[in-house]
């Protein structure tokens, strides 16, 4: 599939709109926007996003994810199609949500490895967010795509960057090594710049697909969540990203502004971001966000 076809499928297949903007009738004070741009590398777009609302078992869910593929887009595409379904199929999703997410991450990775002849030798990072009834946000991630929360204009990182240097002992305990070549970032076995990922069959014995997971209450101080691939975080800090978009009323415009700023700062990677926006009651009459 050509890069342009992939981008088109991303836009029309996930939010039900080609504008990159979504709104739920149930949560009239919550909206989301997203945007993405292909990097300067000579390969098709490898970032995939999910940004949608759905009702499951009588609960209203917001599902948000960034999948940043490497060495091909097939694993990221597979995750876009299957990971949330696998999470929601876990029998204990409503009683032990974190355990359900962890099990789904690991079992999904097992399927990806089994299908490596079809899906290729590459892999993908993932950061996922499940918003439950507008009250609780559960974040999980492997790799270096991030989720950042803004409360009263202050950035707080909800995900964990799984850098090889931080997990060197675990990698070495599995028989791998972390390279530290001057002028380059640390890499697992001299190849991969993240210590946790989906796929990557040739490196998997030295990698993990076990996610870091945390939950956050959504309260009146919560303004928005920012999900973005590392093409953003290579060129700006969490607070710089929040400061850039916190005064923008339309979440799609906010996502677009963030990507344009990353490109202007010479980010050359594929970049994707999602901005779920929470309208505080006192601001409903003042702020347009749909």
Swiss-Prot record:
Q: Is Hydrolase a UniProt keyword of this protein? A: yes
Which one of the record's GO molecular function terms can you name? protein serine/threonine phosphatase activity
Sequence ranges assigned to domain PPM-type phosphatase in this UniProt record: 31-278
This protein's cofactor list reads:
Mg(2+); Mn(2+)
Please give the Gene3D superfamilies that the UniProt record associates with this protein.
PPM-type phosphatase domain (3.60.40.10)
Q: Which reactions are catalysed by this chain? A: O-phospho-L-seryl-[protein] + H2O = L-seryl-[protein] + phosphate; O-phospho-L-threonyl-[protein] + H2O = L-threonyl-[protein] + phosphate
**What general EC class does the enzyme of this chain belong to?**
hydrolase
- Family to which this protein belongs: Belongs to the PP2C family.
- Write the protein's name: Probable protein phosphatase 2C 20
Q: Which gene encodes it?
A: PPC3-1.2
